[in-house]
Amino acid sequence: PQFQAYNRKELELDDAVRYRLIFDEAHNLISANETDAPVVDKCEKFIREDRKYFGGFIFASQDIKDFIPEDSQQKNIAKVKTLFSQTTYRFIMRQDTSNVEKLGSIFSQELSDSELGVIPQLGTGEAILNIAGLRNVKFKIETTEEENDLFGGGA
């Protein structure tokens, strides 16, 4: 209903209710494994349409290799790459040097060799933000002691 109301100029953009679906440890749901292919297909469909419904997806995982295991079939690798290509913002944090080649293959032409080379050297709070292949920004998030206490440093 919001989409139609917005198109009829009955709803202002600022008044639209937005949503985000957050998938932490997303590799448990989305990967190039054959068993995950239907989920990848469904997520891609949702991502293609979510903006018109004022929605979005966040996929988080620590290791890019978890999305594309070594024994993956090429057709499933292509599906995962297509899914990633539909995301507007990609935050790439430190990865092991063994993941650099995989990152280069997934984000081909979007990360320079020097940016790929920096990824294993990124420190705590540092990331490269890849904006839909248009621009890359290296940045660092600094947290206060209170924020660190709030998050507890993980398990």
Residue ranges and their predicted role:
Residues 1-117:
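Conserved P-loop NTPase motor cores
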